[in-house]
Amino acid sequence: MVIWNNDDDDFLEIDNFQSSPRSSPIHAMQCRVENLAGVAVTTSSLSSPTETTDLVQMGFSDEVFATLFDMGFPVEMISRAIKETGPNVETSVIIDTISKYSSDCEAGSSKSKAIDHFLAMGFDEEKVVKAIQEHGEDNMEAIANALLSCPEAKKLPAAVEEEDGIDWSSSDDDTNYTDMLNSDDEKDPNSNENGSKIRSLVKMGFSELEASLAVERCGENVDIAELTDFLCAAQMAREFSEFYTEHEEQKPRHNIKKRRFESKGEPRSSVDDEPIRLPNPMIGFGVPNEPGLITHRSLPELARGPPFFYYENVALTPKGVWETISRHLFEIPPEFVDSKYFCVAARKRGYIHNLPINNRFQIQPPPKYTIHDAFPLSKRWWPEWDKRTKLNCILTCTGSAQLTNRIRVALEPYNEEPEPPKHVQRYVIDQCKKWNLVWVGKNKAAPLEPDEMESILGFPKNHTRGGGMSRTERFKSLGNSFQVDTVAYHLSVLKPIFPHGINVLSLFTGIGGGEVALHRLQIKMKLVVSVEISKVNRNILKDFWEQTNQTGELIEFSDIQHLTNDTIEGLMEKYGGFDLVIGGSPCNNLAGGNRVSRVGLEGDQSSLFFEYCRILEVVRARMRGS
C-alpha cells in the first residue's frame, strides 16, 4: 500500500555557446575556488593540475567532484580524501573523511574564536587579523563593519533590487551584456555588502568590471556562488566580449540529430529573431488560487491531439534553447510555471504540450504551501529574522554537516542577545536559501531529508526508499524529477477525454512523476511503455506499479536507442497506439546549477531531446495514418 504524506534561480539566459575543451568540473573549479565565501576550511593551496589529472585517471567521477565542491569542501581536501579512500567508494565515505580533516584542523588551530568566526564567514585572514588589532577581539560588530567596508566599495555600483534576484519580465531579457554598461538606474556609492561580493569575485580571478556588472545585473539578494555561476557560464560561452561590443549574431553548431530534423524542409520561423521571455509571475496559463486564468489558446492544426504530448525541461536554459525546442514541437510556445504556486518549493520549468487548457483541476488533498505548514515542528525554532515562507528549488545534492556546524558556530556567540548582528543574519540566511535548510533546534539548521523531499514533490512516502537506492541516489533522482502536483494540474484535462483508461509512452521516466500524477488523478493506465536508463529508477517505478495495484501493463526499456521506429510501430500495432507521449530529456546540460557543461541542446544528455522528437513523429504519423 502506498502511503501519502499529508502531514507535513541560474539567472540569465546565455547565448548558445560551444563547450570549451578545458571544461571538466575539476578544471573549472580550479579557476575560481580559492576564495569562495563560506568555504569549510581554509587551504594553503589548491590541487595542482597534475593532481586533478591523476584523479581523472583513477576513474573518479567529475559529477561527484562537482557535488562535493558545491557542498562547500575545499578542492585540496576533496583531492586528499579521494586519494585516501579510492575513487569507487560511496560519496558519504569521502565526506566523512573530509570531516575528519576538518576536525583535526580545528583541534590543532591556535587562532582565536574571533578569527575562526570571521574566517568561517569567508573573510580574508589578513584583513580579519588587522580588524581585530584595530577594534579589539570582543568588539564583533565593529570588526564586521570594518571587514564589510573598503575604499573600493565607495565607488562600486549597487545592485538592482528585484523579486527572486532577477525581474524576468524586464524588457531587456534578450539583450546582450552591453546593456549593463548603459543602465540609467541610480547607484548607491556605499553598498558595503556588494563591495564584499565584488572583492571576493576579484580574488577568484574575475576583473572588477566583470564582477560589478554581474552584481548589478543579478541583484543584491544573490549570493556569491550564484554570481560565480553567471560569470563562469559567460566565460565558457566566450561571450564576455559582449560586455564591451555590440552583439554579433553567431551561427549555432548543429549536431547530426539537429541536421536530420532540419533537413526535412521544415520552415524556419521568426522565432529565432524573437527570443522567448520568461514571464513574471511564472504561472503559465494559470494556477490554482491565483488571478490571470487563461482558458483558451490557438494551436496549429498539425499540432492538435490526439495523440497528446507533454514535454518538460528547466525554464532557465541557455539563450536560444527554448526557441529550438518550440521550433521542433510545432512552434508551440512553452508554458512556464514555477511550482512554488503548487507546493512549498520553487521549481521553474517550461512545458510544451498540445493538451487542452480549460477545466483543469487540482489533485486532492492539496499540498502544503508554506514552510511552517509543511514543517510544523520547525516553527518552534524558527528565528524571527528568517522571513522565508518558501523553499528554493530542490537540488540533486544536500548541505554538508560542516555547513550546518558553521552556522551553529556563527550564531552561538549571540545566544544571550535578542538576535545576532545583521552581518551574521545575512550569512546564515544566504546559506539557508542556497541549501534549503530548515530550523530543527536552537542554532540548528538542517538540510531536507529524502522523505521530506518526496512529500514536497508530491510523491508517496518512501517512494524512493530502499530497493538498493542510496541516499545520494535518492537526492539526485528527486532533484531531477517532476513536481507531481504541477504536472497533474496540466494532465487533469485528460480525465474526461479518456474515461476508460489511457495508453502512455513515457520517455526518460525517472522515478515516475508522470505515472504518479496520472494515478493520483485516478486516470487508469491501461499501458505504460517506459524508457529509463537508471536501473534503480526502473525498479522504483516497478515497485510503485505493484504497490498501487495497477491492472494495466508496464513495459520498461533501459535505453532510448532500443526504442527503434520498428519497435514503436510493433507496440502500437499490438496495443492500439498511444494516447499520451510524456517526458523531458535529461537537463544536466541546461541547468543553471551546472557550471561546467551547460552547453544547451548540444550536450550529450540534452541532445536526447531530438530522440523525443523522433519518437513523437513516429507515433503521430502512425496514428494519423491509421
From Swiss-Prot:
Domain UBA: from-to ranges: 59-101, 109-150, 190-232
UniProt catalytic activity: a 2'-deoxycytidine in DNA + S-adenosyl-L-methionine = a 5-methyl-2'-deoxycytidine in DNA + S-adenosyl-L-homocysteine + H(+)
Residues covered by region (Disordered): 160-196, 245-282
Domain SAM-dependent MTase DRM-type: residue ranges: 295-626
MF terms in GO: DNA (cytosine-5-)-methyltransferase activity; DNA binding; DNA-methyltransferase activity
Major place of residence: nucleus
Tissue spec. comment: Expressed in roots, inflorescences and at lower levels in leaves.
Xref: CDD domains: UBA, UBA_atDRM2_like
Example GO BP: methylation
Composition bias, Basic and acidic residues: 262-276
Localization: Nucleus, Nucleoplasm
Biased composition (Acidic residues): 160-187
Record keywords, A-Z: DNA-binding, Methyltransferase, Nucleus, Repeat, S-adenosyl-L-methionine, Transferase
One Pfam family this sequence matches: DNA_methylase
Superkingdom: Eukaryota
Keyword Mitochondrion: no
Listed GO CC annotations: nucleoplasm; nucleus
Similarity section: Belongs to the class I-like SAM-binding methyltransferase superfamily. DRM-methyltransferase family.
Known partners and oligomeric status: Interacts with RDM1.
Protein name: DNA (cytosine-5)-methyltransferase DRM2
Annotated source species: Arabidopsis thaliana (Mouse-ear cress)
Gene: DRM2
